[in-house]
Amino acid sequence: MNPPPDESRHPTLRPPPSTTLKIARVTLSDRASAGVYEDRSGPEIERVWAEHGGETAEWVRVLIADERAEIEATLRRLCDDERCDLVLTTGGTGPAPRDVTPEATRAVLARELPGFGEIMRVQSFARVPTAILSRATAGTRGRTLLINLPGHPRAIGECLPLLLPAIREALRHLRG
């Protein structure tokens, strides 16, 4: 009898249909939150998730400005009160003074998982040398996995599929 396929080697394998994750996608943008332009990064997270075999999800959608205190409060609420399995942020990871997503994320994490940010930088750097400026990170708070994704929709499409096997594995560990 053959063992079941290893999902980490087959990222497009889907879990049983009864598996539903509660996922928050948090767009961090002063201009999008002020209505200057439409948020394209948040919807791109959902599109890429579905296209690349992400589990069935109940989505919590958040769009806020680059304000560290508000970001921290939002991340705590999503983890502690709303009990999201996964929180994916987009935006605010660059070197600009108002890019405070990594600092806000680290302030709420119990444990940092730096490999997520490292692989996104390596993957993106191959196409866009300025990707090295990203300060994205990831980690856990309680049973929630938090990941800072890039702010550009194209970069989300390049990075999120690479992370799916590790996301699944981390969520398995967090769920016990």
Ranges and model annotations:
Residues 1-176:
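Non-catalytic beta/alpha edge segments that cap or flank active sites
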